[in-house]
Swiss-Prot record:
Entry keyword Protein biosynthesis: no
Name this protein carries in UniProt: Dihydrofolate reductase
EC numbers on record: 1.5.1.3
A GO molecular function held by the record: dihydrofolate reductase activity
Protein's GO biological process: dihydrofolate metabolic process; DNA replication; folic acid metabolic process; one-carbon metabolic process; tetrahydrofolate biosynthetic process
Residues annotated to bind NADP(+): 9, 15-21, 53-55, 75-77, 113-120
Binding-site residues for substrate, renumbered to this chain: 29-34, 69
Homology family: Belongs to the dihydrofolate reductase family.
Amino acid sequence: MLRFNLIVAVCENFGIGIRGDLPWRIKSELKYFSRTTKRTSDPTKQNAVVMGRKTYFGVPESKRPLPDRLNIVLSTTLQESDLPKGVLLCPNLETAMKILEEQNEVENIWIVGGSGVYEEAMASPRCHRLYITKIMQKFDCDTFFPAIPDSFREVAPDSDMPLGVQEENGIKFEYKILEKHS
């Protein structure tokens, strides 16, 4: 069974967004997101990023689709003509996973939001890990990360993951990996 990971940055009140944007500006965290979701061990493959409609359109137009990754948008209201060529439209996460299982060009699959997609993904038996950036501050948010089930446990960091508390623009944050155990 093909599995996936989630990647998210959350503040102390589990907020992840405000008015379709990120509530904070942390360049090094965005670079970490980009590097992590692009990294493959096989140079002939790429990774997929799976997101809901609001998350896709929340990415600045100049930066979407997210480069060097297969972008998959989950929506039952969009048409293929609403998205650029090369962006895959699927009605739900399981359909996207079945399509990805049929081809051999994708190495890693990353769930990148939003709230409803994260919730569905964490409940799935396909869910492997949650890469979470814990922002040690509260921000005004209107979109929140769902409660993390007890089946997730912290595991050792990846070799290229910055360790310990980081700080940028007066905002402290830390990278963690949680793995789902059955």
